[in-house]
């Protein structure tokens, strides 16, 4: 296909990557769907090289699988795999909260300014709240000062993003997130480690169940 002559290959690869990722996130491309490099090149009006770059990047990030004879496939959702990732995430975050409760300088003012606000000041944009939710949980781990723990936690965050973000497509879930984040922060600030950990664990477990429900529903609707 003829590509726009002004576009550099690397920015083209970025555009193809972003578009495919959006297609996967919005269920236009469904888990198990197969396609070839040629299909993508034609649809995106791009040459093979940037398309290949974009596809391999999505494969590295766990969104696609490559089959050398039959092209590419959107990786089927494996809820056992997501379950395992959520379990590891809980372990890391509980350890972080426990450590934060013992620290003199917690440095959580920034998180409080976002989550402990009047109802009228709460945001309701799903994408924005989803990004802020990630920043909240990553922020708790980063606040411990353990860079290796934060790195591992962020890797898991990236792997579960595809299903986790669906939690914020419902207003009731956004409201619950504000309430729960506020309570978790309160408990940490009061250095009540057991309570903070219990609140956090319940918060993540409920979110995990909601996400599974919403994902299965969205897949059923998309498959018609």
Identify what each model region corresponds to.
Residues 13, 178, 206-207, 221:
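Anionic, Ser/Thr-rich low-complexity intrinsically disordered regions
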Residues 85, 102-169, 177-190, 195-206:
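Conserved amphipathic alpha-helical segments that form helical-bundle/coiled-coil interaction surfaces
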Residues 205-214:
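Short arginine-rich
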Residues 1-102, 213-224:
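Short linear motifs at protein or domain termini
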Residues 34, 168-173:
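Short capping/connector residues at structural and topological boundaries
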Residues 60, 64-65, 156-158, 173-174:
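Mobile beta-alpha loop/short-helix "lid" or hinge segments that flank ligand
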């Amino acid at each position: 296909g003829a590509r726009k002559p002004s576009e550099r290959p690397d920015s083209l690869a970025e555009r193809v990557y972003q578009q495919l990722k959006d297609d996967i996130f919005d269920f236009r491309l469904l888990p198990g769907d197969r396609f070839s490099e040629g299909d993508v090149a034609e649809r995106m009006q791009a040459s093979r090289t940037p398309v290949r770059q974009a596809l391999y990047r999505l494969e590295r990030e766990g969104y696609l699988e490559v089959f050398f004879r039959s092209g590419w496939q959107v990786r089927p959702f494996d809820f056992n795999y997501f379950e395992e990732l959520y379990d590891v995430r809980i372990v890391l975050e509980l350890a972080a909260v426990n450590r934060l409760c013992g620290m003199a300088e917690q440095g959580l003012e920034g998180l409080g300014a976002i989550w402990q606000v009047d109802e009228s000041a709460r945001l309701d944009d799903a994408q924005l709240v989803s990004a802020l939710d990630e920043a909240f949980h990553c922020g708790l781990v980063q606040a411990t000062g353990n860079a290796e723990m934060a790195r591992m936690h962020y890797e898991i965050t990236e792997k579960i993003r595809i299903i986790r973000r669906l939690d914020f497509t419902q207003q009731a879930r956004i409201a619950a997130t504000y309430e729960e984040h506020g309570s978790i922060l309160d408990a940490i600030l009061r250095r009540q480690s057991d309570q903070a950990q219990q609140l956090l664990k319940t918060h993540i477990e409920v979110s995990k169940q909601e996400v599974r429900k919403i994902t299965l529903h969205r897949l059923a609707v998309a498959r018609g």
